[in-house]
Amino acid sequence: MAARRALHFVFKVGNRFQTARFYRDVLGMKVESCSVARLECSGAISAHCSDYTRITEDSFSKPYDGKWSKTMVGFGPEDDHFVAELTYNYGVGDYKLGNDFMGITLASSQAVSNARKLEWPLTEVAEGVFETEAPGGYKFYLQNRSLPQSDPVLKVTLAVSDLQKSLNYWCNLLGMKIYEKDEEKQRALLGYADNQCKLELQGVKGGVDHAAAFGRIAFSCPQKELPDLEDLMKRENQKILTPLVSLDTPGKATVQVVILADPDGHEICFVGDEAFRELSKMDPEGSKLLDDAMAADKSDEWFAKHNKPKASG
């Protein structure tokens, strides 16, 4: 399964300005793309698998009905880096967190230095490992070291209610390799290749709560494998959230997508690799597009003027 790749994790963000500051100034990531002009419209569907971020017509008042943006950030191109997809709905101010997303771990002494310089809260949870939070409460673990590899992002940790059941799903059905397993601590580290970001499954008691802030992890595989993957899930009576579909992006590649859910309801997007590589190329204007979008965003003022709070997700 080495042809499969870990791509990105989708976060819902309520404060786009502070979120951009965290990813750019604290972590040191670059803006890969910002799909403001193309996708900020009611009913738009992102070929990066964030269609669930759409807002219904009656969610909040004009002029922000259904208006949202998507920004990709990372330490390098998504071809060989694990990145974050930040989805922002203009009419939503915050999202309730569950216990499903447990954190992203990255190795970057520069990020630790940046956080200290900017007085961004850090808590040392192990020797040389610092816990911090992105706006919205999403946890990040910063290892105070730098690796020779190009991508500092080491792993994404998700909560599971039954580790063995989850391992059967992720390994036997999705083809991931077990890199580490600790029965006593109820954790396992999985991946598709040694040089890719890993997926860590951590057992929790009392079940997995996705709340409103639930995200989605995305992978790619050769496009020809997608129908077989969908058929396998059907045969195994596993949940398919979005059957195999082609998503068009004007002026760009058409990408095939299937969206699954694991036994705990974690959303998993698989895309056809060949077209996705074309679609996910870095946009040199990405950072400027984000800055322009934030400068033009008067939603906070509009809601305050009309004495309306932004919705809570």
Curated annotation (Swiss-Prot):
Coiled coil: none annotated. Its main location: mitochondrion. Keywords: Mitochondrion, Phosphoprotein, Repeat. The modification N6-succinyllysine is found at K288. Pfam families: GLOD4_C, GLOD4_N. Interacts with NUDT9. Expressed in heart, brain, liver, kidney, pancreas and placenta. Not expressed in skeletal muscle and lung. Transmembrane segments: none annotated. This is Glyoxalase domain-containing protein 4. It is found in: Mitochondrion. Residues 5-145, 152-273 form the VOC domain. Belongs to the glyoxalase I family. Expression is decreased in hepatocellular carcinoma samples as compared to adjacent non-cancerous liver tissues from the same patients. Transfection in hepatocellular carcinoma cells and overexpression can inhibit the cell growth. CDD domains: GLOD4_C (cd16357).
